[in-house]
C-alpha cells in the first residue's frame, strides 16, 4: 500500500529527502501522470504507475494491498505471501531501488504539469 511504499523509499534512500518530496515531482510522481517523464526519477515513477496498472488488471488493489517486507542493508526485500501481495510489493520495491539510483532535481518538484507534461 502507499504507506508501505513510502517506508520502502525511506529504506532504500537512508538519510535522503522525506517521502513527501516524491509526491509532487515531475509528471508521474504523485497522483495521476501524463506526458513524457522529465528525468530518470520521474521515469521511475512512470514505471511504478505502469506496474500498478498491471496489478489492477490482475484484479489487485495496489494502493490498498498490505504485504510483508523487510529492509536489509538499505534494500527492500519482499516476503512471499500471495499473488497480489507479491506483485504489488515487487512494484514498490523496484521503484524504491530506482529512486535510490536516480538524482533528485529540485527544479522538477511542484512543476506546472499542464505545460511541462504533454
From Swiss-Prot:
Cofactor note: Binds 1 Ca(2+) ion.
Ligand binding (Ca(2+)): 28, 30, 32, 49
Cofactor(s) listed in the protein's UniProt record: Ca(2+)
Subcellular location: Secreted
UniProt-listed CDD domains: PLA2c
Pfam families, sorted: Phospholip_A2_1
Residues spanning the signal sequence: none
Family: Belongs to the phospholipase A2 family. Group I subfamily. D49 sub-subfamily.
Listed name of the protein: Acidic phospholipase A2 PA-3
Species: Pseudechis australis
